[in-house]
A protein has these predicted regions:
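N-terminal secretory signal peptides that target proteins for export/translocation
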Residues: 1-6
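Bacterial N-terminal signal peptides
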Residues: 9-21
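Sec/Tat signal peptide C-region and signal peptidase I cleavage site
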Residues: 22-28
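Tryptophan-anchored aromatic micro-motifs
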Residues: 29-50, 62-68, 92, 143-154
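Predominantly extracellular/secreted and cell-surface proteins with exposed
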Residues: 60-129
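Edge beta-strand at a domain terminus
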Residues: 134-136, 144-192
Length: 192
């Protein structure tokens, strides 16, 4: 009569235990459907700004449409132009629509055109006129829940005229500067 080896029995039990674990759907967040755009302030207030609709295409690109919620913004007439703005404590942050034609598509590895649709400027409530050199660019990075962007400093005068290369997003990393946490009222944008 053969005796069972305890190690083999222990190994069999471990294998059975692993097989009994339920299968979990581990799909990552997808660039598909309607997602919410939310700003988080330095005092952890979350402000729903609107939504973005993602529509995958068959070629690996994803078409997008950004829709900001007008009721969340106040109108400011700056430098002969109307801006949609958020009034914060000590800082006004205004959306700056990208002013030139662009493809309206992204890929999972290149979110630049979406980032260019989420440009903002900031200024003091007492400032007169748009301070276009006070631009904010939110470089988006994937998270488990969606996309998150921290502000980077840009000069919005850079896009006052159309680019010589219209198919390439103008704000490349060399046109952007990091901003220390806590300096700007809007600390991050999320798309979830």
């Amino acid at each position: 009569m053969r005796r069972r080896r305890p190690l083999l029995t222990l190994g069999s039990l471990m294998l059975m235990g692993l097989l009994a674990v339920p299968v979990v759907d581990a799909r990552a967040w997808e660039l598909q459907g309607v997602k919410s755009i939310t700003a988080t302030t330095r005092d952890n207030q979350r402000i729903a700004l609107g939504s973005v609709r993602f529509e995958p295409r068959g070629d690996g690109r994803v078409a997008f449409t950004v829709s900001l919620e007008p009721a969340r913004f106040t109108d400011h007439f700056l430098s002969m132009k109307e801006f949609k703005c958020l009034d914060g404590p000590g800082e006004v942050v205004c959306h700056v629509p990208y002013p030139h034609a662009q493809p309206g598509t992204i890929t999972p590895d290149d979110l630049a055109w979406l980032e260019h649709n989420l440009l903002f400027l900031y200024q003091l409530p007492t400032d007169f006129g748009a301070k276009l050199w006070n631009g904010l660019y939110f470089q988006l990075e994937p998270t488990e829940q969606g996309l998150r962007g921290r502000p980077q400093a840009i000069d919005l005068n850079y896009i006052s005229a159309p680019s010589d290369t219209p198919g390439q997003p103008p704000y490349q990393p060399e046109q952007r500067d990091e901003i220390a946490p806590g300096v700007r009222w809007i600390e991050s944008l999320t798309i979830e």
